[in-house]
């Protein structure tokens, strides 16, 4: 008897091509229902309708289609169990070898502003999860596919295994199936809780395991990466290089967040590059082309850039690739790499190259999630953009046009530096970064010493207010001509007075940007 494949999907992307390969290449008989059956029939494929297979029609307006012993018996029967096989033979039930099911679009339905309670309830799938769970439970004998993303890899595996799905892949598919149904049920419970004002977070849904990482922050720590496919870093494509580590991903996240201040991909306002070490930017710059922006970012602090992570907001071409080969780097992320760039960078076999599309970034959602002992903290991303017309002049002297441009650049950077954070910048390039000190003047001292002689004529940004006038006085002693900070200290007046005395311009943003 030909093997049986059951197909019943809400997301019909790729289902015709999958069914054609199953039937015409691997000899599967096709069992289907409702809209999926019609799509397959319209494509000229022979399909046994579920009502014909079960000997019973769909009832209750389609609420009951697949909840039948001929379906679940065929899925759950253990092939090596004589009693199970006897039951199938006695009832005339064919075994079902492959189940392709994805569920009613509940999340998409409840995301609509005009959705009613009854509409949402009707989009709670019952038969689909039952088939998925049954197939996942019996993964020793049945393969279960819950996403179009799985189709090509499963067909490739079948092509190498005489039309069968390998056992190790069946087990992985079962894991993903249980994750799929768990996330689905969590979405329903979250929605129902929201109706009674017990709103939760989407991050409390089950998030599938993407991969086991090389190690955690240190080699003695084990680590795993959980991520939704196609969302954020889950949608990144690693083109070459070693396996990613926890630190790689944390640094990549910091680098990407910083470079996105200048737009990303088609939305880039101009070429920009960022170099990160230990989640802090050590070099940030803009330029007329990607290669020049990258060179300027590396030149900002080549000592710290060694072993760093680079993010670029535009396509990487050959000139930028050659710049990247000039020192040891861990990872590079960009929207794309040209064939010439990839050929050049292939010489650095251990360098991890990641392509991350703007669509994957957009799909990640607005939440910033951190863990604490036994729980999660979920907050909005700190990604609201302030424009210079929202800032307040605090000093007698306004900044010059060049100073104002430099202050805007520095302000974009400082919120991506660990608090207490100070950035010294000029002409679209960071010159010194002071991060993570327990007092603000300590961070300022680090940033100014890093900038050295380049601090003369540069500007300084602070992620929090100046509690005393010591920071602006230190800045002036190094040649800083303008500063920007949120303001809000009870002693703001002292810092303003010091700036007026020393000839500095000061802008107040009214918004703090702590980063822990």
UniProtKB/Swiss-Prot annotation:
Alphabetical GO biological process terms? 'de novo' IMP biosynthetic process
Cross-referenced PROSITE patterns: MGS
MGS-like domain boundaries: 1-146
Query: SUPFAM superfamilies from the entry?
Result: Cytidine deaminase-like (SSF53927), Methylglyoxal synthase-like (SSF52335)
Which reactions fall under this protein's catalytic activity? Answer: (6R)-10-formyltetrahydrofolate + 5-amino-1-(5-phospho-beta-D-ribosyl)imidazole-4-carboxamide = 5-formamido-1-(5-phospho-D-ribosyl)imidazole-4-carboxamide + (6S)-5,6,7,8-tetrahydrofolate; IMP + H2O = 5-formamido-1-(5-phospho-D-ribosyl)imidazole-4-carboxamide
Q: Return the InterPro entries for the record.
A: AICAR_Tfase_dup_dom_sf (IPR024051), Cytidine_deaminase-like (IPR016193), MGS-like_dom (IPR011607), MGS-like_dom_sf (IPR036914), PurH-like (IPR002695)
* Domain of life (superkingdom): Bacteria
- The region annotated as signal peptide is none
What is the designated name of this protein? Answer: Bifunctional purine biosynthesis protein PurH
Database matches in NCBIfam families: PRK00881.1, purH
Is Repeat included in the keywords of this UniProt record?
no
Which terms in the GO cellular component ontology are assigned?
cytosol
Write out the entry's keywords from A to Z: Hydrolase, Multifunctional enzyme, Purine biosynthesis, Transferase
- EC number from the UniProt entry: 2.1.2.3, 3.5.4.10
Kindly give the Pfam families that the UniProt entry links to this protein: AICARFT_IMPCHas, MGS
Tell me the route in metabolism or biology where this protein functions: Purine metabolism; IMP biosynthesis via de novo pathway; 5-formamido-1-(5-phospho-D-ribosyl)imidazole-4-carboxamide from 5-amino-1-(5-phospho-D-ribosyl)imidazole-4-carboxamide (10-formyl THF route): step 1/1; Purine metabolism; IMP biosynthesis via de novo pathway; IMP from 5-formamido-1-(5-phospho-D-ribosyl)imidazole-4-carboxamide: step 1/1
Family per UniProt? Belongs to the PurH family.
CDD domains hit by this protein: IMPCH
């Amino acid at each position: 008897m030909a093997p049986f494949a059951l197909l019943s999907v809400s997301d019909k992307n790729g289902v015709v091509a999958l069914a054609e390969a199953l039937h015409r290449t691997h000899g599967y008989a096709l069992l289907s229902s409702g809209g999926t059956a019609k799509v397959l029939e319209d494509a000229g494929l022979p399909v046994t309708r579920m009502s014909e297979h079960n000997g019973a029609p769909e009832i209750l307006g389609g609420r009951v289609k697949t909840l039948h012993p001929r379906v679940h018996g065929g899925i759950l029967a253990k092939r090596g169990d004589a009693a199970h096989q006897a039951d199938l033979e006695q009832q005339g039930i064919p075994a079902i070898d492959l189940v392709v099911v994805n569920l009613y679009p509940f999340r998409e339905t409840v995301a609509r502003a005009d959705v009613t309670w009854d509409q949402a309830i009707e989009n709670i799938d019952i038969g689909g999860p039952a088939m998925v769970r049954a197939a996942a439970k019996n993964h020793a004998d049945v393969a279960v596919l819950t996403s179009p993303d799985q189709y090509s890899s499963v067909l490739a595996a079948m092509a190498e295994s005489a039309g069968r799905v390998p056992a190790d892949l069946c087990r992985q598919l079962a894991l993903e199936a249980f994750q799929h149904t768990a996330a689905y049920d969590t979405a329903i419970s979250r929605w129902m809780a929201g109706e009674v004002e017990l709103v939760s977070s989407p991050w409390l849904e089950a998030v599938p395991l993407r991969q086991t990482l090389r190690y955690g922050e240190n080699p003695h720590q084990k680590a795993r990466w959980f991520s939704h496919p196609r969302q954020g870093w889950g949608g990144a494509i690693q083109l070459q290089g070693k396996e990613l580590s926890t630190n790689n991903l944390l640094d990549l996240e910091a680098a990407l967040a910083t470079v996105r201040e200048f737009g990303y991909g088609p939305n880039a306002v101009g070429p920009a590059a960022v170099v990160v070490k230990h989640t802090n930017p050590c070099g940030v710059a803009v330029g007329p082309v990607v290669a020049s922006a990258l060179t300027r970012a590396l030149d900002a602090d080549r000592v710290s850039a060694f072993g760093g992570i680079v993010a670029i907001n535009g396509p990487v071409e050959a000139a930028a690739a050659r710049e990247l080969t000039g020192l040891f780097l861990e990872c590079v992320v960009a929207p794309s790499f040209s064939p010439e760039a990839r050929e050049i960078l292939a010489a650095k076999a251990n360098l991890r190259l990641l392509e991350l599309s703007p669509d994957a970034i957009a799909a990640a959602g607005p939440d910033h999630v951190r863990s604490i002992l036994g729980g999660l903290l979920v907050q909005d991303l700190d990604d609201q953009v302030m424009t210079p017309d929202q800032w307040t002049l605090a000093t007698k002297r306004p900044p010059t046009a060049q100073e104002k441009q430099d202050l805007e650049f520095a302000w974009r950077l400082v919120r991506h530096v660990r608090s207490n954070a100070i950035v010294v910048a000029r002409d679209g390039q960071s010159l010194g970064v002071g991060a993570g000190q327990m007092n603000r003047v300590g961070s300022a001292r680090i940033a100014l010493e890093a900038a050295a002689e380049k601090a003369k004529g540069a500007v300084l940004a602070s992620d929090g207010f100046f509690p005393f006038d010591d920071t602006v006085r230190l800045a002036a002693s190094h040649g800083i001509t303008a500063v920007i900070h949120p303001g809000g200290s009870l002693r703001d007046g002292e810092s303003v007075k010091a700036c007026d005395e020393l000839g500095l311009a000061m802008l107040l943003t009214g918004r703090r940007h702590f980063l822990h």
